[in-house]
Amino acid sequence: MALPMLPGNSVNRNLGKDKFHKSQHFDYSNGVAMMVGTEKPGIGGDLLLGQSARAKYSRFPKGEGSGAPAWLAFDKQVLCFDAYFNEAVPQRREEKYRVRKCKIYFYLEDDTIQVVEPEFKNSGIPQGTLIRRHRIPLPAPKDDCFYNVHHFNINQEVLFYSRNFMITDCDPFTRNFLVKMGVRLNPPASTPADPYTTLRQELEENMKPLRPYERLDTLKQFLEHDRQVLRFYCYWDDSESMFGDPRELILHYFLADDTMEMYEVVPPNSGRDTVPKFLHRGKLPKHAPIPKRQPGEITDRTVLNVFGPVGQGGPYILDSLKTGALEEEFYKDSDLTIGAVINVWGRRVLICDCDYFTKEYYRSKYGIEDFPSISYKASPPPKPAKQVPPYTGFGSEEDSLCSCQGLLPKPPQKDFKKLMEKDRRGLVSNVLRFVGKMLTDSPVDKERVFIICFYLTDDTIAVFEPPQRNSGVIGGKFLERGRVKKPGQELFKSEMSEYFTAQDLYVGAHLLLNSQPFQLVDADDFTFSYMEQHADEFPKANIGTIISKVKSISEEQQKTVKQFFTMSDPSSTGSLPYESFRTLLADLDVELSEHEIMTLGRVYSVRQQPEVNVGLMLAVAQDHLKKKNFEKFSEMIQAFTHEDRDRCGQLSSKEARIICKAFRLPLSDDLLRALLEKFAGESEKIDYHAFLSGINWRENPVPAVLPEDTVKFDADWRGEAPEPAVKTINYSLLLEDVFGSATNINDS
């Protein structure tokens, strides 16, 4: 029972309120007074009658994933549904309705929908986009809302603008997306067949023409042989016509469409104009020239029984027998072979050769293996020798020749490659130096000694005469450096003169340098070594050639050689002096030059190691240690004694070297190794007491090293006779190489 509305029985609803404002519910919109605050609360924020409060927070929990907006999270993601709709066809006997298949695309980024109908052959209706992409509203009475993803399912109808679309299936992406959203998908439905389309298919299947239409399909040939061209080298003899001459042509056959084109190879200075093409690209008929045809005579197909209006859409029948059709024969790839003569619009062209690709094509397609080329080019006439005017005597011959080769004179070009290869490199001077004597009857000039230098960089020769005491001749430069002509040549001639080369200089050679005869009697060690290292350039220093000459002696001379060696070496030591060896070879009938004899002696000489002065080595070592202020000799004694387990006063060379390196002994490796070898005993162990005593510059100083005691490279060699480098010859080794096996001299 309710309480009566008396004072004290009613509840004051304003108790505890602090807001009593009124919301604006009425306003003008486009000049019309209307209610605009349907969503606004009443006085003090209380809800009006019939209003429901909107939840401040969602009832659904926040899921995992990115918080990106829908237009970014679902960009380029579209749901695709297969659907159809029935369209009524009034006033037609063949069909009452039409089943039209379509695709429904739902764009997740903005909930827009697009309906597209695929194109079907001979449908007779416009197809494509039926409903453009936009948001489609729901049917009334909810037309204020739009379709979203929850309104779509398989085997379900949707209504777009009063047209029912039956969704039958969807693609895998759509299916997975809907399942992940929790949508329970219906089983797929089948699309009913269109009655009229079925009838048309039955009629087309029953239609059997009397003959199949001729199909002209060149796409396959184009796709298989595109950019493949056969190249042939041809010859056309046009010498019978006036002002005609043989022509050289290049034929290109395009496999993509069986067309040809030809180019003419115009030789230089032929008097003919160069044209872009000799024959434009196109099919070449075999029986050319052909008469001109009327328009319509040559067509792809023959049309018979034309009736009705002529033009587009008019009926016609094709002639299956091709009565009266003109057939033209064109050249194919099978007609183009080497040796074949083709008719190029009345010109007989001979195919003489082809390139590698063309040969491979015919080999793979036709099995042709032999491609004999036909020689059609006449041998070019010999070029006339260029007449050069004779040398006038002014300047060098090279300079005069360059001035005759063009209107603008140019300086002669030097051999830059030879200059870079033979130029001086460090101590390698690439200069061959010989000792020469003047060939004259004057007793004063006979004793004069000359240094003849040959520079390999530019084949120049310089002669220097070293001064001799009490000779009465002032030494110095005898011949300026330059190229020297060989004797017996004319001065004023058109041909280039011959100059002395490096092969003309060897020990024993006679040279005529500017009308002055010289004989080369000796050379320095670098010259001998260089000529032996480049034996292919210097035959006088080729040991193989020299031995072959010695092998060519007769058997009597071989016995003479053996007897000479036996008499010269009674002790059978296998060696003899070089002078005796030289006398023996000079008497043989093999015509060995002095340089060849000296080369043979250098190869089979007995090498003797030069004695090293220990005092000089110790002086050099103490000088280095003194400059570096090295005084750790007592510590080194302790280190050597610690390593000497047997207390014998000796250590191996390896252990001594390790200790010296540990104390950073400031000596070079070569000097340290030589000192350790000198202080090694018979057991190849180092007497470290003697070694340390020898290098101790504090307690045992040795005399300082004098400048004349040091070994230097004599760059200013003056031709003095040094100590002979070859003293003794190992003739036993020589006999073994010459006669093929070691020979017992005493038995012979």
From Swiss-Prot:
Q: Which UniProt keywords apply?
A: Cell projection, Cytoplasm, Cytoskeleton, Repeat
The UniProt record lists the EF-hand domain at 556-591, 631-666
Give me the segments passing through the membrane: none
| One biological process term in Gene Ontology | specification of pronephric distal tubule identity
Task: Name a single GO cellular component.
Answer: axonemal microtubule
Q: What does this protein do?
A: Microtubule inner protein (MIP) part of the dynein-decorated doublet microtubules (DMTs) in cilia axoneme, which is required for motile cilia beating.
Name of the protein in its database record: EF-hand domain-containing family member C2
Species the sequence originates in: Danio rerio
